[in-house]
C-alpha cells in the first residue's frame, strides 16, 4: 500500500494572499485518504492490531487517533516542553510513538485528532478560559460538556502546541475538531471570559484558523478541519462561527461531517435522511463543491468528509456505508474518514487492497 503523501504536502503561507486572510500553497495527496477513527482507548487496546490489519489488507490507508480522552485529558505522555507542563499523572496510551511507527510500517499514515474548544480537563486547570453561567460555575451544553472560549489566546496557543507535539511524535497530519461555538444548550446563559459579544463568531473562528495556518501550516504540518455538514449549505455561520468560504483558505483539507442521521426530517425531501445516505451526501457535496469552485484556486482545500458507520436513524449496512463512499467519489472528494465511536466498522464495505 502506498503511503499518502501527507507528510510531503507543503503548507507554506504566501505573501500574495487576498486581503483579510493568508492562502496556502497545497500539494495534492498521492492518493485519496481513506481512514477510520480510533479513540485513545482503542489505540491502547489489543484491538489496535486489527486496525493495522486493515491498513495491510483493505483500501484503508490512514488511522485517525484522538490525542485527548473524551473529557479532554491528554491521552499520552507528551514529549515537547509546552505540553509536558500539562502532562497528566496517568495516560491511556502508554506507547504512542511506537503505535505511530506501527502505522507507518503497515503502509499507512497517522492523523492526530484534536478536539479544540470542547475540553473539560483544560478548563479545570485554567478555569478562566471556560465558558460560565451567571453564577460563575462552568456552563455545560445539553449533553453536559464544558466548553472553552474560542477567543482565548491561551486556548488557541494550546491547540498550536498540541499540533506541534503531534508532528514531533511522528503524525502525518493534524485534524482539528470542535472549532466552533456551542450549538446547543442554554446558549443565552453563557458568560464568555474573552469574547466581546460583538465580534462576529465567524471572525473569531477565522482568526483561530489563520493562527493555525501561520503557526502550524507554514511549518510544513498538514492540517484538516472538521465542520458541520450543513456548512456546505448555510450561507451564514449557523450561529457557531463556521462559514465555508471563510475557513476554506486556511486548511489543506476540510472534513464536513455529513452523517445522514444528523440531518433533520425533510432535508432534500426525505422524511428520514439516515435512510438515504447516498442522496444526502451527494446533494451536500454538490452544493458545497460549487461554492468552493468559485474561490481562487489557491484558496480551495481538498474535501474529505466524515462518513457514518454507526446506527443512528437507521441500522447501517455494508451497502449504506459503501453508498456514502460512492457519493464522495462522484463529487470529486479527496477520500473519506469513517466514524464509529466504538471502532466497529463494516469491514465488508472496505474493498480489499489490490496486490
Tell what function each PLM region has.
Residues 61-67, 94-140, 175-177:
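Glycine-rich, aromatic-flanked loop segments that form ligand/cofactor-binding clefts
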Residues 75-87, 119-142, 182-196, 242:
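Aromatic- and acidic-residue-enriched segments that line the glycan-binding/catalytic groove
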Residues 251-264, 274-355:
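Substrate-binding cleft of secreted/luminal carbohydrate-active enzymes
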Residues 47, 53-58, 102, 144-179, ...:
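An active-site-proximal structural segment forming one wall of the substrate-binding cleft
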Residues 29-43, 117-168:
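Active-site-adjacent "subsite" loops/lids of carbohydrate-active enzymes
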Residues 34-42, 80-93, 143-157, 195-203, ...:
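The substrate-binding groove and active-site-proximal loops of carbohydrate-active enzymes
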Residues 37, 109-119, 175, 201-240, ...:
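Aromatic-lined carbohydrate-recognition surfaces of secreted/lumenal glycan-active proteins
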Residues 49-73, 167-173, 250-253, 328-336:
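Catalytic domains of carbohydrate-active enzymes, especially glycoside hydrolases
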Amino acid at each position: 500500500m502506498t503511503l499518502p503523501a501527507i507528510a510531503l504536502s507543503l503548507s507554506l503561507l504566501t505573501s500574495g494572499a487576498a486581503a483579510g486572510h493568508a492562502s496556502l500553497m497545497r500539494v495534492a495527496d498521492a492518493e485519496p485518504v481513506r481512514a477510520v477513527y480510533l479513540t485513545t482507548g482503542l489505540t491502547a487496546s489489543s484491538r489496535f492490531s486489527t486496525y493495522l490489519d486493515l491498513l495491510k489488507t483493505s483500501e484503508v490507508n490512514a488511522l485517525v487517533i484522538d490525542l485527548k480522552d473524551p473529557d479532554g485529558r491528554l491521552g499520552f505522555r507528551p514529549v515537547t516542553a509546552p505540553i509536558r507542563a500539562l502532562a497528566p499523572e496517568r495516560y491511556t496510551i502508554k506507547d504512542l510513538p511506537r503505535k505511530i511507527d506501527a502505522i507507518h510500517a503497515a503502509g499507512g499514515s497517522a492523523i492526530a485528532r484534536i478536539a479544540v474548544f470542547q475540553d473539560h480537563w483544560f478548563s479545570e486547570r485554567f478555569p478562566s478560559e471556560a465558558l460560565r453561567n451567571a453564577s460563575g460555575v462552568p456552563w455545560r451544553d445539553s449533553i453536559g460538556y464544558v466548553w472553552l472560549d474560542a477567543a482565548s489566546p491561551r486556548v488557541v496557543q494550546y491547540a498550536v502546541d498540541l499540533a506541534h507535539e503531534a508532528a514531533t511524535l511522528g503524525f502525518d497530519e493534524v485534524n482539528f475538531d470542535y472549532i466552533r461555538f456551542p450549538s446547543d444548550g442554554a446558549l443565552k446563559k453563557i458568560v464568555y471570559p474573552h469574547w466581546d459579544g460583538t465580534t462576529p463568531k465567524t471572525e473569531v473562528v477565522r482568526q483561530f484558523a489563520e493562527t493555525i495556518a501561520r503557526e502550524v501550516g507554514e511549518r510544513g504540518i498538514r492540517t484538516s478541519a472538521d465542520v458541520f455538514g450543513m456548512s456546505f449549505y448555510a450561507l451564514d455561520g449557523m450561529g457557531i462561527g463556521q462559514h465555508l468560504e471563510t475557513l476554506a483558505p486556511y486548511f489543506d483539507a476540510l472534513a464536513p461531517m455529513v452523517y445522514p442521521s444528523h440531518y433533520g426530517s425533510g432535508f432534500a425531501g426525505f422524511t428520514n435522511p439516515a435512510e438515504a445516505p447516498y442522496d444526502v451526501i451527494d446533494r451536500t457535496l454538490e452544493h458545497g463543491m460549487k461554492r468552493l469552485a468559485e474561490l481562487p484556486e489557491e484558496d480551495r482545500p481538498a474535501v474529505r468528509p466524515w462518513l457514518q458507520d454507526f446506527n443512528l436513524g437507521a441500522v447501517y449496512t455494508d451497502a449504506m456505508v459503501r453508498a456514502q463512499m460512492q457519493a464522495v467519489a462522484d463529487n470529486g472528494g479527496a477520500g473519506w474518514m469513517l466514524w464509529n465511536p466504538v471502532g466497529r466498522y463494516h469491514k465488508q464495505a472496505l474493498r480489499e487492497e489490490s496486490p
